[in-house]
């Protein structure tokens, strides 16, 4: 098997926007993976949450990592609630239900790293 190693750069100004299902008052950009780069294991998005912006309670078959870059984001699961400040991070297991909300009056930005769904999901 041959692997071709090639760096892939996505410039912020050229990152495509995408609609994240179940999100309101959230603008999302795809930075890596999916249609942007050949990443085989995960994709990376950047989500800008306006005040009271939210991702409704949902789960998926892929694990997720959230890293807050600016502002504050509250992540709620069935077993815990945590408010994340800049450079705080959070792991959400595959199948774990979560709600994400910006409860502040200032915008918040979060990096989203998500594994691809297992084949057949």
Label each PLM-derived region with a short phrase.
Residues 1-41, 121:
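A short, N-terminal "cap"/entry segment at the start of jelly-roll beta-barrel domains
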Residues 30-33, 43-60, 94:
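Conserved short histidine dyad/triad with adjacent acidic residue
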Residues 46-50, 60-75:
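Short, conserved beta-strand element in jelly-roll/cupin
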Residues 47, 91, 106-121:
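A short hydrophobic beta-strand segment most commonly corresponding to one strand
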Residues 55-57, 75-76, 92, 98-105:
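Short beta-strand His + acidic residue motifs that chelate non-heme Fe in jelly-roll/DSBH
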Residues 59, 70, 77-79, 102, ...:
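Residue-level recognition of conserved beta-strand positions in structured domain cores
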Residues 79-94:
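Short acidic-glycine-tyrosine-enriched beta hairpin
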């Amino acid at each position: 098997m041959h692997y071709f190693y090639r760096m892939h750069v996505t410039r912020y100004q050229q990152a495509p926007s995408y609609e994240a299902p179940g999100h309101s008052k959230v603008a999302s950009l795809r930075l890596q993976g999916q249609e942007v780069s050949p990443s085989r294991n995960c994709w990376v998005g950047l989500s800008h949450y306006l005040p009271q912006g939210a991702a409704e309670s949902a789960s998926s078959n892929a694990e997720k990592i959230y890293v807050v870059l600016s502002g504050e984001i509250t992540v709620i699961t069935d077993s815990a609630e945590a408010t994340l400040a800049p450079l705080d991070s959070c792991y959400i297991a595959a199948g774990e239900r979560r709600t994400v909300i910006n409860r502040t009056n200032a915008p918040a930005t979060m990096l989203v790293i998500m594994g691809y769904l297992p084949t057949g999901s």
